[in-house]
């Protein structure tokens, strides 16, 4: 019943309202809302960089909080690929072809997930993927799994279905339907994509080099190029560098273009992970 209700809810209106509310500077009200949130979701205050709750002017300021550098261990061994976010690994595996990519118990096509971009479909049709779900309790900044140079970024408008673990199984192709930002990088392991998937109540999707991507929500696909022939400044990020963040829970899908990456042996579905945890081991200098 709750799943069917999502099809009829004014999801965009709800998201805009909560996004507006989360950006309001409401003084003591904001302070008490944050305290309530901390209690409900058992937020670990020991790892927060700014512990003074009163210093957060809005709820979003707290939600997108930074943590202390030493709270997440990054292994800088160049052959190691790390988890980009705190959350739960809901699925991972090898992409057999363009027609078979299973995410959260649903079969997707690369064509639908990558917004019909034929170039990227060709690159990733024999690749590897990891899906990380971020719940409201998690640290919500997204980091780089390995060193990479940004090639392009695509904003894909879409629905705002909840990606909560209680609902995703009953909504087919949810990641292809939902709003998302696709970031393509060139790495020493070949090409990599980080897909930041939106969700109901998720106010914004932001990247470290651009800021808020979906603030207009005008229903138009947008493309930014960052290669040497574009007008945009080249972007290079190191492993562990912040590359983006959500306001409220959502999902990150990480794709690699080659099958010369070995998934960590004891990695399992529905395993809790943190930024810096080892996902896989790779062979470098892929052409």
Curated annotation (Swiss-Prot):
Superkingdom of the source species: Bacteria
Database matches in InterPro entries: PS_Dcarbxylase (IPR003817), PSD-B (IPR033177), PSD_type1_pro (IPR033178)
Free-text remark on how the cofactor is bound: Binds 1 pyruvoyl group covalently per subunit.
Active-site residue numbers: 86 (charge relay system), 143 (charge relay system), 250 (charge relay system), 250 (schiff-base intermediate with substrate)
Cofactor(s) demanded: pyruvate
Site (Cleavage (non-hydrolytic)): 249-250
Enzyme superclass (EC): lyase
Location(s) in or outside the cell: Cell membrane
Pathway field: Phospholipid metabolism; phosphatidylethanolamine biosynthesis; phosphatidylethanolamine from CDP-diacylglycerol: step 2/2
GO MF term list: phosphatidylserine decarboxylase activity
Record note on modification: Is synthesized initially as an inactive proenzyme. Formation of the active enzyme involves a self-maturation process in which the active site pyruvoyl group is generated from an internal serine residue via an autocatalytic post-translational modification. Two non-identical subunits are generated from the proenzyme in this reaction, and the pyruvate is formed at the N-terminus of the alpha chain, which is derived from the carboxyl end of the proenzyme.
Record's bilayer topology term: Peripheral membrane protein
Residues bearing the modification Pyruvic acid (Ser): 250
Reaction(s) this enzyme catalyzes, per UniProt: a 1,2-diacyl-sn-glycero-3-phospho-L-serine + H(+) = a 1,2-diacyl-sn-glycero-3-phosphoethanolamine + CO2
Subunit structure: Heterodimer of a large membrane-associated beta subunit and a small pyruvoyl-containing alpha subunit.
Function: Catalyzes the formation of phosphatidylethanolamine (PtdEtn) from phosphatidylserine (PtdSer).
Name of this protein: Phosphatidylserine decarboxylase proenzyme
Organism: Wigglesworthia glossinidia brevipalpis
